[in-house]
């Protein structure tokens, strides 16, 4: 499913339980334990502010609790649609801050991602006391997608606990209520979250220079350390911000191209343009899987740039490349503009890319090699036709 307005899809309106919660409730449900037995309810303390001449103006604050199987964050989205978006101008800019007892589950995170994708004028900060089911790969993936959609996702530290306590907890003189081991538990929760988010981080500069290096290496041991990376950027025709990601094939597991296909299928998108940067061109199996995926989605535009050709002298690998061209996938060799774009989008946009010696010479040499493969299989005219297609939204 594509992005949608969650509130428009549901008529039932949820309301905050109150503006404040008791100290006992906060101490029990917001305690940032590594193992939190008996804490099945989800609590969400929220504040909504609006920009007014560049100064934030507080509009609403309160507390949500789950309603049966409907988690607190989804209750908030329904309420926000009915009580804020329907009343105020849809063009106003809002900042939403959440303090949550549990981080979103993968289903709620998916709905939050889609809500943010529909409402570009919203900014969302999510501070969680504890991480929910983060061993689950789908949960990890959707937490990363929240960040990619522009949300700030963080564990509650002492500063955030104090802010939440001061604004949302009924006060009793002389009782700080924050308890012992808060900082120790925060470091535990934060380390787990950062480990998850690092997996979606752009490549390090060192990794980029070593893995996307397009020249022949002298030492075989170094050659085998070159890993199959796939960096992708997905652009939709509805004006939404591009989605980016970087995938790595792990030894003995699925190749990065298959991981990429699984990810794109889960989004159920159409009429998109996807640009991929690969360290190695696809193997025959991955090439055929990519070709089948493209044939099933004629509106999708997929352009693959590769730094190096993988076993290009073997006919099965050449045939795999041919299947990509025949399906309408554009396959090219990375040159200086592509290396620069990959660096900017996936490594470090604040620092310039410094090309290594001989980059463009080797790129042209690899391009000639790829062109000879096209010609030997009689595909040059077909590839030229695909290359002349307009890359953009369908004409109305």
Curated annotation (Swiss-Prot):
Keywords in alphabetical order: Antiviral defense, Cytoplasm, Hydrolase, Immunity, Innate immunity, Metal-binding, Repeat, Zinc
Cited PROSITE patterns: CYT_DCMP_DEAMINASES_1, CYT_DCMP_DEAMINASES_2
Assembly information from the UniProt record: Homodimer.
EC number(s) on file: 3.5.4.38
Descriptive protein name: DNA dC->dU-editing enzyme APOBEC3
Residues in CMP/dCMP-type deaminase domain copies: 38-154, 205-324
Primary residence: cytoplasm
Binding site for Zn(2+): 71, 105, 108, 255, 283, 286
GO molecular function, one term: RNA binding
Annotated organism of origin: Cricetulus longicaudatus
């Amino acid at each position: 499913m594509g992005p949608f307005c969650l509130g428009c899809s549901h008529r039932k309106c949820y309301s905050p339980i109150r503006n404040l919660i008791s100290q006992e409730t906060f101490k029990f449900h917001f305690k940032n334990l590594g193992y939190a037995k008996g804490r099945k309810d989800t609590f969400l303390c929220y504040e909504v502010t609006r920009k007014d001449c560049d100064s934030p103006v507080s509009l609403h604050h309160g507390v949500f609790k789950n309603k049966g199987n409907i988690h607190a964050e989804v209750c908030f989205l329904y309420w926000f649609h009915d009580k804020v978006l329907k009343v105020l101008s849809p063009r106003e800019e809002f900042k939403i801050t959440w303090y949550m007892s549990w981080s979103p589950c993968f289903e709620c995170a998916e709905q939050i991602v889609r809500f943010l994708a529909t409402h570009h004028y919203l900014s969302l900060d999510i501070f969680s006391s504890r991480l929910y089911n983060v061993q689950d790969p789908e949960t990890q993936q959707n937490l990363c997608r929240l960040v990619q959609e522009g949300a700030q996702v963080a564990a509650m530290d002492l500063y955030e606990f104090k802010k939440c306590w001061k604004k949302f907890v009924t006060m009793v003189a002389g009782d700080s209520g924050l308890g012992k081991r808060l900082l120790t538990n925060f470091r535990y929760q934060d380390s787990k979250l950062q480990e998850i988010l690092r997996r979606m981080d752009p490549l390090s500069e060192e990794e980029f220079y070593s893995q996307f290096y397009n020249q022949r290496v002298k030492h075989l041991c170094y050659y085998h350390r070159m890993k199959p990376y796939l960096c992708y950027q997905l652009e939709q025709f509805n004006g939404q911000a591009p989605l980016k990601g970087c995938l790595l094939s792990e030894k003995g597991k699925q190749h990065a191209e298959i991981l990429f296909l699984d990810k794109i299928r889960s989004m159920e998108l159409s009429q998109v343009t996807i640009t991929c940067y690969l360290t190695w061109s696809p193997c025959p199996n991955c090439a055929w899987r990519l070709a089948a995926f493209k044939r099933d989605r004629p509106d999708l535009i997929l352009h693959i740039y590769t730094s190096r050709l993988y076993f290009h002298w073997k006919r099965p690998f050449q045939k795999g490349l041919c299947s990509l061209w025949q399906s309408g996938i554009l396959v090219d060799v990375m040159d200086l503009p592509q290396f620069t774009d990959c660096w900017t989008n996936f490594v470090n946009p604040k620092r310039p890319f410094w090309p290594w010696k001989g980059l463009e010479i080797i790129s042209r040499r690899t391009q000639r090699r790829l062109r000879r493969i096209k010609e030997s299989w009689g595909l040059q005219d077909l590839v030229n036709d695909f290359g002349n297609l307009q890359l953009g939204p369908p004409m109305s």
